[in-house]
């Protein structure tokens, strides 16, 4: 079937609405919407919830950009795309809670198509979801990964193991030699066996995010925390910033295509701290995190 970018866009707009509504229902605060246009073509709508009852900052961004030439970040590993016009659309979100016992979560789903006269379009889907805890709870990790596995199951037994490994490999801070969190799913360049199958999988990932995350929020939101936990949360948020600015391909793509900087950097935590050569106290809950985020089979 010929790729149908219009249907993908309509799903993404509905997905943004659905996720924002569910996050607001849990938090009690509302999102503020900021619609924007891109001079070179396209635009989007960024929605941010700040200083809510549970979420310090939650950003859910929809973007749809297009142009006459591919950016360098996209053609570096796909040289056959040079000289093609392109459309890129997606929903990307990051949620940073107040409570350090609630993990930070990230998800995104996206569609890309590049065309030129006289040639078949080149298209693919990408996306995923991943979880970044500050204090590890095994039941939360198991729930997160079980939900990820279950949404993959209709598409084949090998889908979850493959995309879990890809997620573990992708969200790795090489300069720190550590994982960003406990992973989840990551996929890119998905265009087989056909458009309908790939689109259905992308929808399953997008719709699965709130099923994976919100039960964890409900389970942890009443836990009492203090200055010690907050300081550790801010310190670990530094790793999040480092990954996004140094390693994340999506951030690089957005900046290279003249995307909207405020929306691209919306994933950044509102507060963060670095401390030179800080080490957690041996045997402490903070020290346990480094072991908790090691790659493993959670289910």
From Swiss-Prot:
Report residue spans for region: Important for dimerization: 240-275
What does the record give as cofactor?
a divalent metal cation
Against SUPFAM superfamilies, the record matches this protein to: Coproporphyrinogen III oxidase (SSF102886)
Which residues does UniProt mark as catalytic?
106 (proton donor)
Extract the InterPro entries matched here. Answer: Coprogen_oxidase_aer, Coprogen_oxidase_aer_sf, Coprogen_oxidase_CS
- GO BP terms: protoporphyrinogen IX biosynthetic process
Q: An example Gene Ontology cellular component term from the record?
A: cytoplasm
Sorted alphabetically, the keyword list is: Cytoplasm, Heme biosynthesis, Metal-binding, Oxidoreductase, Porphyrin biosynthesis
Q: Which Gene3D superfamilies match?
A: Coproporphyrinogen III oxidase, aerobic
Q: What class of enzyme is it?
A: oxidoreductase
Amino-acid positions noted as binding substrate in the UniProt annotation, renumbered to this chain:
92, 108-110, 258-260
Pfam name, any one:
Coprogen_oxidas
| Site (Important for dimerization) location in chain | 175
Molecular function, one GO term: coproporphyrinogen oxidase activity
Record-listed a divalent metal cation binding positions: 96, 106, 145, 175
Q: Which EC number(s) does the record attach to this protein?
A: 1.3.3.3
Its pathway?
A: Porphyrin-containing compound metabolism; protoporphyrin-IX biosynthesis; protoporphyrinogen-IX from coproporphyrinogen-III (O2 route): step 1/1
According to UniProt, the reaction catalysed is: coproporphyrinogen III + O2 + 2 H(+) = protoporphyrinogen IX + 2 CO2 + 2 H2O
Where is the protein situated, by its record's location annotation? Cytoplasm
Primary role: Involved in the heme biosynthesis. Catalyzes the aerobic oxidative decarboxylation of propionate groups of rings A and B of coproporphyrinogen-III to yield the vinyl groups in protoporphyrinogen-IX.
Q: How does it assemble?
A: Homodimer.
What family, per the record?
Answer: Belongs to the aerobic coproporphyrinogen-III oxidase family.
Protein name, entry field:
Oxygen-dependent coproporphyrinogen-III oxidase
Source species:
Salmonella enteritidis PT4 (strain P125109)
